[in-house]
């Protein structure tokens, strides 16, 4: 009923010769005449192609985990900078699933997947001049040097330490449920979930700090005299700052497992763990670097001619710089997203836009997992069909062998064939030749 009336087979005489046709042609003919079977075949081929061809471009490491990307809803809004900000941006920063920007008039914008607390932007901040974005909270300072924070409100993260009251702020940094602030006199203050993030301001108590960079594990500081100091309490690979760069550093950046610095002569130095070949600094940036930023597993450098060069992890195209990223005035990278603000105030972004089907509780892309699961299912199904086919050939061949052995040959006057229609009470397989 759903697929049309089934075609009736033509009634033929039992003595009428039937045209011989190979089994394969018979199968194809019956398949083409059966709309339901054809529909099933099309669906099967589509699923097969999706499971075995798409993974050529969409790779998924079965051991991959990322706590910053877990349980994310489907969508592609991570890089959706509001239109009012695209040509009027002053500062833009990224969290794991969202972005925050400030325009030249000091107004704050947010986009992406936001928690309820992230949407509660303080209304009385005045003209905001700088922001820092963490896992799920934001820091901001206005033109008077006053500090504000909103977002995640546990672990004391929403409470600004009293020692910062009346202090003017020089630099702010937001990490994984931790905030770090540098005052104008070079002192460092941190607060938040310090049990999860290894940060000790005691490491720089006798130093005048210029800026701080944090990742999801710890932080490093750059002093005003060009030295880099790790803020970790425990020994890490980031502690191994090359001696030859101390006193010569202009800019610093962090990935999850490595640190990088731009020196006064424009060269770039990377140390820590060489994940994603992060130590392989492109030759075209050496001696020409003026700024640097880092995401989870990649680095981006701005050269003196205003262009950007990126390297490291590229699973979300975070290290694939678009051609229009030129005439760069400011650079920002966070997690798997990047942004540059051009000299005319326009914005260019690249990197992770979002997830088609979201992520699971380990931060894995659900769509990629479906492709991997489909490969396994299709492989098992293919093996099962091969086994079934082999069994059919063996059993069918055995039955034919029995028939051939059980009767004389056709030349002796008795043979076998399968007519389309035969009278009731007659042997459907064998007949006497007259």
Regions found by a protein language model. Name each.
Residues 387-392, 397-434:
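Generic hydrophobic transmembrane alpha-helix motif, especially the helices
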Residues 98-101, 110, 137-140, 149, ...:
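Conserved core positions of repeat-based scaffolds
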Residues 9-25, 354-367, 401:
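Short, membrane-interfacial amphipathic segments enriched in basic
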Residues 29, 60-91, 95, 123, ...:
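Periplasmic/extracellular loop-to-transmembrane helix junction in inner-membrane transport proteins
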Residues 50-64:
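Transmembrane helices with small-residue packing motifs
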Residues 1-39, 87-90:
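Transmembrane alpha-helical segments of polytopic membrane transport and secretion proteins
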Residues 79-85, 111-124, 151-164, 192-205, ...:
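Short glycine/serine- and acidic-residue-enriched loop/turn motifs that recur at repeat junctions
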Residues 39-41, 47-48, 87, 91-97, ...:
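Transmembrane alpha-helix signature in integral membrane proteins
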């Amino acid at each position: 009923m759903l697929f049309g009336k089934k075609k009736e087979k033509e009634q033929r005489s039992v003595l009428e010769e039937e045209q011989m046709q190979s089994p394969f042609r018979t199968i194809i003919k019956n398949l083409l005449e059966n709309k339901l079977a054809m529909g099933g075949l099309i669906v099967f081929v589509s699923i097969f192609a999706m499971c075995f061809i798409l993974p050529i471009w969409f790779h998924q490491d079965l051991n991959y985990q990322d706590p910053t990307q877990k349980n994310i809803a489907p969508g592609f809004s991570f890089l959706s900078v509001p239109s009012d900000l695209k040509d009027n941006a002053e500062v833009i920063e990224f969290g794991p699933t969202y972005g925050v920007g400030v325009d030249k008039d000091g107004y704050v914008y947010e986009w992406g997947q936001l928690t309820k607390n992230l949407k509660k932007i303080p209304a009385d901040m005045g003209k905001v001049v700088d922001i820092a974005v963490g896992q799920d909270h934001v820091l901001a300072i206005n033109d008077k040097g006053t500090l504000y924070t909103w977002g995640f409100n546990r672990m004391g993260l929403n409470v600004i330490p009293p020692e910062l009251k009346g202090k003017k702020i020089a630099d702010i940094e937001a990490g994984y449920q931790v905030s770090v602030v540098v005052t104008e006199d070079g002192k460092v203050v941190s607060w938040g979930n310090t049990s999860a993030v290894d940060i000790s301001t005691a490491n720089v108590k006798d130093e005048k700090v210029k800026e701080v960079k944090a990742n999801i594990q710890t932080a490093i500081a750059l002093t005003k005299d060009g030295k880099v100091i790790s803020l970790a309490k425990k020994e890490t690979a980031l502690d191994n700052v090359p001696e030859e760069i101390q006193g010569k550093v202009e800019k610093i950046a962090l990935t999850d497992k490595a640190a990088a610095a731009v020196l006064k002569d424009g060269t770039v130095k990377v140390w820590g763990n060489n994940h994603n070949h992060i130590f392989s600094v492109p030759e075209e940036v050496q001696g020409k670097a003026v700024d640097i930023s880092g995401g989870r597993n990649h680095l981006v450098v701005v050269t003196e001619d205003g262009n950007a060069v990126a390297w490291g992890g590229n699973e979300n195209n975070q290290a694939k710089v678009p051609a229009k990223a030129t005439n760069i005035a400011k650079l920002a990278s966070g997690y798997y997203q990047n942004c540059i603000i051009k000299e005319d105030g326009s914005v260019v972004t690249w990197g992770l836009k979002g997830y088609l089907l979201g992520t699971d509780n380990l931060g894995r892309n659900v769509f990629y997992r479906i492709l991997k699961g489909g490969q396994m299912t299709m492989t098992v199904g293919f093996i099962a069909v091969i086994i079934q086919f082999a069994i059919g050939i063996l059993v069918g061949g055995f039955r034919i062998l029995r028939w051939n052995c059980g009767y004389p040959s056709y030349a002796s006057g008795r043979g076998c064939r399968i007519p389309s229609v035969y009278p009731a009470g007659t042997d459907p397989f064998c007949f006497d030749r007259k």
